[in-house]
A protein has these predicted regions:
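Right-hand nucleic-acid polymerase module
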Residues: 1-136, 146-238
Length: 238
């Protein structure tokens, strides 16, 4: 089996990741180690948190908002209104809530386009307590750009709208972690929604001239995480 070192550089806004990894040219399915369901779950969770972190870093700043949308008694009753008598309550209510958040996103997109306002968001439908892992009352977490916040907030009529600015730091790993740990895992899905106008990370791959290369951050940067084959840093703004 032929192997050689490759370097991957991922640019997510002001956050840069520099990764060295061993690449195999003829790896077969038989070469891959079989993983337990728990190992697969943790691997998928790590991937989803990584991807959402990069998406947030690319598109949102400390000026933007982290929003929690709740359901009042009347709002929750509306979610259950059309539930068939024998249908399980939790899956039905969860799907009904997902329909409501998608309606809100579509409505906000329409009104923002009408007003000439850019609208960007990432959202999850949450019903898990991140501390106890028990079921929690259903709600939504949304990251919204500041320009669209006034319109977005005015369109939610099912309960309260709780807002705060996103964390004033370049790396939004903990925000992505907080959002996804409250979402039930569904195989084959990212478990978060987004508007289609979000920028994607820029990924560059190359074969390093020196396989023993030491990853060193530039001078005008703040190191977020550093290891032998992995470096994540934020470029300092002038």
């Amino acid at each position: 089996m032929a192997q050689y070192w490759k370097e991957k550089i991922v640019e997510s806004g002001d956050v840069i990741e520099d990764i060295l990894y061993l690449h195999s040219t003829d790896r077969t399915q038989a070469d891959k180690k079989k993983k337990s369901p728990d190992e697969k779950y943790l691997e998928n969770l790590s991937r989803r948190i990584r991807d959402l972190t990069r998406l947030l870093n690319c598109n949102f700043t400390s000026r933007d908002y982290f929003v929690t949308l709740t359901y009042s008694r009347a709002g929750y009753a509306k979610l259950r209104a059309d539930k068939p008598p024998k249908a399980p309550a939790t899956p039905y209510v969860y799907k009904a809530a997902e329909k409501e958040i998608r309606k809100l996103i579509d409505c906000c997109r329409y009104h923002c386009a009408k007003e000439g306002v850019i609208f960007k968001c990432v959202y999850v439908t949450a019903n898990i307590n991140p501390d106890t892992k028990n079921r929690a009352r259903i709600h939504h977490h949304v990251v919204v750009n500041c320009e669209a916040m006034k319109i977005f907030k005015s369109l939610w009529h099912h309960g309260r709208v709780l807002t705060k600015n996103t964390y004033d730091e370049a790396n939004r790993f903990y925000l992505a972690y907080y959002m996804l740990m409250q979402v039930p895992y569904e195989k084959g899905h990212n478990n978060y929604g987004r508007t289609l106008n979000l920028e994607k990370p820029i990924v560059t791959e190359r074969v390093p001239w020196n396989p023993n290369k030491v990853l060193v951050p530039p001078e005008n940067s703040t190191v977020i995480k550093q290891g032998r084959n992995y470096l994540r840093y934020a470029l300092n703004k002038p």
